Amino acid sequence: MGLCLAQLAVTCLFLVPFVLSQVTEFVSIDCGCSSNYTDPRTGLGWVSDSEIIKQGKPVTLANTNWNSMQYRRRRDFPTDNKKYCYRLSTKERRRYIVRTTFLYGGLGSEEAYPKFQLYLDATKWATVTIQEVSRVYVEELIVRATSSYVDVCVCCAITGSPFMSTLELRPLNLSMYATDYEDNFFLKVAARVNFGAPNMDALRYPDDPYDRIWESDINKRPNYLVGVAPGTTRINTSKTINTLTREYPPMKVMQTAVVGTQGLISYRLNLEDFPANARAYAYFAEIEELGANETRKFKLVQPYFPDYSNAVVNIAENANGSYTLYEPSYMNVTLDFVLTFSFGKTKDSTQGPLLNAIEISKYLPISVKTDRSDVSVLDAIRSMSPDSDWASEGGDPCIPVLWSWVNCSSTSPPRVTKIALSRKNLRGEIPPGINYMEALTELWLDDNELTGTLPDMSKLVNLKIMHLENNQLSGSLPPYLAHLPNLQELSIENNSFKGKIPSALLKGKVLFKYNNNPELQNEAQRKHFWQILGISIAAVAILLLLVGGSLVLLCALRKTKRADKGDSTETKKKGLVAYSAVRGGHLLDEGVAYFISLPVLEEATDNFSKKVGRGSFGSVYYGRMKDGKEVAVKITADPSSHLNRQFVTEVALLSRIHHRNLVPLIGYCEEADRRILVYEYMHNGSLGDHLHGSSDYKPLDWLTRLQIAQDAAKGLEYLHTGCNPSIIHRDVKSSNILLDINMRAKVSDFGLSRQTEEDLTHVSSVAKGTVGYLDPEYYASQQLTEKSDVYSFGVVLFELLSGKKPVSAEDFGPELNIVHWARSLIRKGDVCGIIDPCIASNVKIESVWRVAEVANQCVEQRGHNRPRMQEVIVAIQDAIRIERGNENGLKSSSSSSSKAQSSRKTLLTSFLELESPDISRNSLAPAAR
């Protein structure tokens, strides 16, 4: 015993300096406070956020009776489409506790209490939902920093205004809270409970040198910690406990405990955001003096975790003595929303079970941040006008909402595709790192005060538009400008460039504007003087020949008309003519559709004998052209002006839209009161056919469904962001998602599509669509937005998950539709109840949850709370990576814990397994760490 105490003393000598250094690295921000101060209860210094963040407004709470000085104010942020962020400095690869708190206090003019999103970098941390105005809501993450900073952001208000009360950063020691999965997962603290606590107060710094918050087991919030077994008593000691193990629980926590004097300890604990994979620790220390013939042995009583229940806990034996910590760990366990846990004594034990503390943390998947090279360039650009409002936008440039001056791709990681900083008071040189923004398609830096020469941008092979006019740029024009393969528009007017213009820029392939660069040389212009002189000399001769030339021209025009008439007759005989799409009798410049004569189509379709379906435009027939190309022919004989407008609209739209995930238009015909559209034939029918149609189709496996969802989402995302003006489909449904011969999905049926004007956010129109898919907000307001398509796509995602039709009294009973039914199950944490039985035995639960989560967001009642299609694509791609096992993800260490919640009893243990290397079933038993 003396040796142990000596070792403990020596260890403490080394630990104390480290703990003291920890405190100096604490970051404690009082949001809304106007000045710095020291908390007299803890001795910790708190700083005002007035110099940290420009946005938002401080609010002083009316009730100032709080013991903590930190909860007398809060900072409120606007309810717009921006995010508001605090940046905290970190050391790369070091672990930290990041903690935010929220006390509403009852002030505010909102009709509903606030509900909004909380993000750390690009990862959605939590949905903050205020239900009690006088309760402090705490959100805590354990992270390993991957850079020199982390961003904590609030955004996306559903009701009320986003706000924050405090923000804290606490560095951790050595390998505390290390996991095998920290490259891909944060730890979101779900519970940290001090059993046997002397009062209701939470225990934290200075009693815990790392300032963890240990909640008292006496302070039982509704549904938080209930169900104490009879005979549970509280014990404590003042003796020193050796707590120098991996997680360093505080001494005061280990000096108290609960004991089951009747042989059982039992609790029920609600875990928010569960079911999920979790990391759990139990802390035991024998703090009672046991007699020579007394023993304390017990087991975890948990029927769903037989591997854990087999292990016997003998604290004194496991910890090598009394008053010494034993901390068995459960590094990867799947837990339900409602966790019931019990410890029961073994038959050969004389004493009941004992418990000092527990910690449970959810594995929170880390979302990929925007490409680092892109972010570094954006940061450099922001430093060129640091006091501007646009430069103070924080967090990730692309996720969860875009900065106001960038556009991003939907890839993983996201890449910046557009920088729009016209007239933004930029000063200095263009950052050289811009050459590594390979996804950039548009660069707008005009009307600023840029100086210096153009940096190397030869790697910007996707660049289409570059505007640099009205700056103070100088030097020669680099040769690479003539060799950017996709460059369409380049403007360098009103600068100080000099030297020769690369000849390729003058050949007409690029819209090139370069006026008012006095020292810029154009060889063609140097020859211009002599050309003018020659023309002047020849002018007299031209005047003399004018009359004769006019006569010759008149004759030539007459011959041309006769030739054109003959050519037109000849090409119509062939049945295929290239026309510009027509709207209201006027030619459109944006694209070309092909006119196919009616006889040609009658021959191709065998007089329209093989009907393969019907869409909003009309009946669809199978055809084969003379060259062997298979086509789908959509036809209507209705001569109404409404359908005429619809026909013209669809031809005009599809003539200029080309994307791999949109069904391409091949041609059209308008003869004999028939309006016909000819599309590429899709061999595998529609998604609706496979989910709800003939039994001839083999059930789609989960990975195929995810791939189809991704394809369709990319098609819709292109309509929303890749077209100018953007296009709203407004009839998204599973029967309008067609599958080609390789089972790749393409979105079809643009008969109901609508274009939005560039300066509008919506289109007013009579609500049209399909029952079960129709956005309720659109139906009520008649205001069509891109979020109407997002709602309909959310319904499609629920179809993919469940295999059920959107509307079915048989399937959904009183819920009537798939949205109400699925959301009610998700609220209960029962995603298993949604899964199509055809695929239930062969899916990974985390991928299912990822899709269910984004589908649930898509069908939010209010459009501004729904994600953009770009965010939906990212979520689906996350699910695909999890399903394929390409992430260093988790593998569940337990049987399915959803049995108590799910009505589907056919789900197997493997349903909840997530792949991961180096974890075997032998590692499932509790292990001292």
Swiss-Prot record:
Pfam families: LRR_1 (PF00560), Malectin_like (PF12819), PK_Tyr_Ser-Thr (PF07714). Glycans are attached at N36, N173, N236, N293, N320, N332, N407, N494. Belongs to the protein kinase superfamily. Ser/Thr protein kinase family. GO terms for cellular component: membrane. Keywords: ATP-binding, Glycoprotein, Kinase, Leucine-rich repeat, Membrane, Nucleotide-binding, Phosphoprotein, Receptor, Repeat, Serine/threonine-protein kinase, Signal, Transferase, Transmembrane, Transmembrane helix. Residues 606-880 form the Protein kinase domain. It comes from the Eukaryota. Its EC number is 2.7.11.1. The modification Phosphothreonine is found at T770. This is Probable LRR receptor-like serine/threonine-protein kinase At1g67720. It catalyses: L-seryl-[protein] + ATP = O-phospho-L-seryl-[protein] + ADP + H(+); L-threonyl-[protein] + ATP = O-phospho-L-threonyl-[protein] + ADP + H(+). Residues 553-929 are cytoplasmic. GO terms for molecular function: ATP binding; protein serine kinase activity; protein serine/threonine kinase activity. The chain crosses the membrane at residues 532-552. It is found in: Membrane. CDD domains: STKc_IRAK. It comes from Arabidopsis thaliana. InterPro entries: Kinase-like_dom_sf, Leu-rich_rpt, LRR_dom_sf, Malectin-like_Carb-bd_dom, Prot_kinase_dom, Protein_kinase_ATP_BS, Ser-Thr/Tyr_kinase_cat_dom, Ser/Thr_kinase_AS. ATP binds at V612, G613, R614, G615, S616, F617, G618, S619, V620, K634. LRR repeats lie at residues 413-437, 438-460, 461-484, 485-508. Residues 22-531 are extracellular. The modification Phosphotyrosine is found at Y679, Y778. The active site is at D731 (proton acceptor).
